[in-house]
UniProtKB/Swiss-Prot annotation:
The keyword Secreted does not apply. ATP binds at T62, P63, A64, G65, E66, G67, K68, S69. GO terms for molecular function: ATP binding; formate-tetrahydrofolate ligase activity. Belongs to the formate--tetrahydrofolate ligase family. This is Formate--tetrahydrofolate ligase. Pfam families: FTHFS. Pathway: One-carbon metabolism; tetrahydrofolate interconversion. It comes from the Bacteria. Keywords: ATP-binding, Ligase, Nucleotide-binding, One-carbon metabolism. The gene is fhs. It catalyses: (6S)-5,6,7,8-tetrahydrofolate + formate + ATP = (6R)-10-formyltetrahydrofolate + ADP + phosphate. Its EC number is 6.3.4.3.
Length: 553
């Protein structure tokens, strides 16, 4: 059976049963049907004691797929089986990848969160609420221009964009306000995909409703004609925007195929945002379980770095262990093997491609957190390839655990779970910080480029230098850095596989995200509104007369 067939044939427990198992009072459980619920954490008396936190990351993604979410879910099931108290905290899927190329984000095989089709399609409406809130703010800005422009906003400086939760390249560059003086002030604008909206980052970093509203009010929307910054608070609409997110801020509860409680909430991409699920979701799981397994988007150079340098300080809890997911076939691809040949034994390509995993291992060890590698097993992997990879990893002084979560779920992940339990009990002391937030913007960027990516230097466009000067002048240079970079390579060139070194990173622009609390550094050709591929996944999705969905993955 494929993923959706496995999901549809699963025996799900009522969500109230899952909530009780997780220790939630029935009064805070707000069901969305039989198998989904919102958790009203603001009505819950919080447990101040936090469990162990396990961060799952991976090597750079390849067309072959790494199975990071699959390993995350399988590990969560195995930990729950072994300890009786584990939860999973994941991001919500975006409709863009579901209908585009990447597919959903619920794991695979017998290591899935369910109901898979509901989660991948609309879920509890969080993405729509974020889209509505984002576009309401955009409409209010343009209405302010139309109604006399009391704040003297320079339309050419407006940085707040409209958004849509679908890949639509035709909306990357648009002109609005056409049709005469009753149709608004004409100006150029752009659409982003919803998960790239600053509101998504804010939702995922907010500690509560008060913090949410304060962060929204801090959003920089434009400059006035005197060059002074204009914020949402100047429009007096922060409360209205926060109101539209009053339900979206509540974490969502579902279950795995193994009936492990899973909280799915928030979904920023790691290549254009910080790539982590919400602080509220992670903290809720930590308060209710001995072990919380969470993941960060794309490879460790993006998602894990941002988890550790952006999310962890807000969360107030560092990971107790890090799992790096790798596959034999993805490393062979990094070693020069062709996509069509990845099922053929090629130890030489594996050894060449290992440098990609090796750099990720060294990067994670830099933070002084225990690390292990999960070798996500595929049927095409040969014994010689697996044994070779295990020896290479163990030469780094860490463990390598072969995992078969797709085919066996939690049962195929118990060795990994036992290793994680042992690592999480190791007292390593405080996490080592990568950089000092109070350092110069250029120094922080260069530190990431040199220490994490393996580059040698950074080149800035005139626009990027202008933004740095603006940040310094306004006292915004103390914010952490959120790199927007290709997920396929350590460099800003997606074709440079393996572990490129001594390259120059090209910074095109810097987006100032005061509400989220970081600076987005735009590199290479990263797009905040993706396009659909020649054969989008939507072509294979269908529904029959009984409401059964096919083609989701």
């Amino acid at each position: 059976m494929n993923d959706i067939e496995i999901s549809q044939n699963a025996e799900m427990l009522p969500i109230q049963t899952i909530a009780k198992q997780a220790g939630f009072d029935e009064k805070v459980v707000e069901p969305y049907g039989h198998y989904k619920a919102k958790i009203d954490i603001f009505s819950e008396k919080p447990n101040t004691q936090l469990g162990k936190l396990v961060l799952v990351t991976s090597i750079n993604p390849t067309p072959a797929g790494e199975g990071k979410s699959t390993v995350t879910v399988g590990l969560g099931d195995a930990l729950n089986d072994l300890t009786g108290s584990a939860m999973i905290a994941l991001r919500e899927p975006s409709q863009g990848p579901v209908m585009g190329m990447k597919g959903g984000a619920t794991g695979g095989g017998y290591s899935q969160v369910i109901p898979m089709d509901d989660i991948n399609l609309h879920f509890t409406g969080d993405m729509h609420a974020l889209t509505a809130a984002n576009n309401t703010l955009a409409a209010l800005i343009d209405n302010h221009l139309q109604q006399g422009n009391e704040l003297n906003i320079d339309p050419r400086t407006i940085v707040w964009r409209r958004c849509l939760d679908i890949n639509d390249r035709a909306l990357r560059n648009i002109v609005i306000g056409l049709g005469g003086r009753f149709s608004g002030v004409p100006r150029e604008d752009k659409f982003d995909i919803t998960v790239a909206s600053e509101l998504m980052a804010i939702l995922c970093l907010a500690q509560d409703l008060k913090d949410l509203k304060e962060r929204i009010n801090r959003i920089l929307i434009a400059n006035n004609y005197d060059g002074q910054p204009i914020f949402v608070k100047d429009l007096h609409v922060g409360g209205a925007i926060a109101t539209l997110l009053k339900d979206a801020i509540k974490p969502n509860l579902v279950q795995t195929l193994g009936h492990t409680p899973a909280i799915i909430h928030g979904g920023p991409f790691a290549n254009i945002a910080h790539g982590c699920n919400s602080v509220l979701a992670t903290k809720t799981a930590l308060r209710h379980a001995k072990y919380t397994v969470t993941e960060a988007g794309f490879g460790a150079d993006l998602g894990a770095e941002k988890f550790l340098d952006i999310k962890t300080p807000v969360l107030g809890k560092q990971p107790d262990a890090i799992v790096i997911v790798a596959t034999v076939r993805a490393l062979k691809y990094n070693g020069g093997a062709k996509l069509a040949d990845l099922k053929i034994e090629d130890v030489e390509a594996l050894q060449k491609g290992y440098i990609n995993l090796q750099r990720h291992i060294k990067n994670m060890q830099r933070y002084n957190i225990p690390v292990t590698v999960s070798i996500n097993h595929f049927i095409s992997d040969t014994d010689q390839e697996v044994n070779t990879l295990v020896k290479l990893i163990e030469a780094e002084g860490i463990s390598a655990i072969v995992t078969d979560a797709w085919a066996k779920g939690g049962a195929g992940s118990k060795d990994l779970a036992n290793e994680v339990i042992a690592l999480a009990d190791t007292n390593q002391g405080p996490m080592t910080k990568l950089y000092d937030n109070n350092g110069r913007i250029e120094d922080k960027i260069k530190t990431i480029v040199q220490k994490i990516y393996g580059g040698s230097d950074v080149e800035y466009s005139p626009q990027a230098l202008k933004k740095i000067k603006e940040c310094v002048a306004n006292g915004w240079d103390h914010l952490p850095i959120c790199m927007a970079k290709s997920q396929y390579s350590f460099s800003d060139d997606p074709k440079q596989l393996g572990a490129p070194s001594d390259f120059v990173m090209h910074v095109n622009d810097i987006n100032i995200r005061l509400g989220a609390g970081f600076l987005v550094v735009q590199t290479g050709k990263v797009l905040t509104m993706p396009g659909l591929p020649k054969h989008p996944a939507a072509l294979d999705i269908d529904i029959d007369s009984k409401g059964e969905i096919t083609g989701l993955f």
